[in-house]
Amino acid sequence: MDITFIRHGHAEHLLNYPKELNRLHPGLTEQGKKQIVSLRKNINIMPHDTIVVSPTKRTLETVELLMTNEHNGAVISPLVGPRMYPQDPKFAPLGCDQIYSMAELSLLYPDKQYIDVGLEAWEESINQMNTQQFTRLAEQLLAWCRKQTGHTFIVSHDGTITNYRMMLVEHDLTRDDFLGEAGYYTVRDV
């Protein structure tokens, strides 16, 4: 199975950096929307492919712009929500990285499906989970992905994507290895 990680486009919390980092649920900017529309030329999502998306406004908007009408839709998982990289318990989570609750998602995106990963990942989020707990839950998500058909696309955040890349194939990554706005990276034969 191959996984392509996609980083969301430019979002509202970066407009007045760093003053807007505690903004709740920032969406994509016009620039971010254009980045994702441009990304569609490089990403070919087929109807049978699996899309897993972080429960944040900017990633859900990214998926809406990436998907074609033929695709069945994306599934939401807190296991691809924002996660700090590198991990440091001294840093407080930022407001922009707060995920939607299941109640909020059911109101805002009633047609979306969820991957059942247990309540702990929704309530605690993966942002500051210790490495062992994150790895255990991430392995469960990857096992679920392996059972799906087609290619898997994960629409997420720089820190989260880097944590998964470290877990899967790469080591010694730094913030310099972040994909950046609307960036993507494919891991083969997961």
PLM segments and residue spans:
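A short, acidic, amphipathic alpha-helical segment used as a generic capping/interface helix at domain edges
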Residues: 133-148
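Short aromatic-enriched loop/helix-cap "lid" or pocket-rim segments at secondary-structure transitions
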Residues: 14-19, 86-90, 167
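Short, well-ordered beta-to-alpha junction loops that form the rim of enzyme active sites
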Residues: 9, 53-57, 78-79, 119, ...
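Phosphate-handling substructures
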Residues: 22-27, 70-137
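Active-site-proximal alpha-helix that buttresses catalytic centers in soluble enzyme cores
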Residues: 2, 6-75, 108, 182
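Generic beta-sheet signal
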Residues: 3, 148-158
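Glycine-rich phosphate-binding loop signature in dinucleotide/nucleotide-binding domains
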Residues: 44-47, 144-150
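Domain-level recognition of soluble alpha/beta enzyme cores
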Residues: 169-190
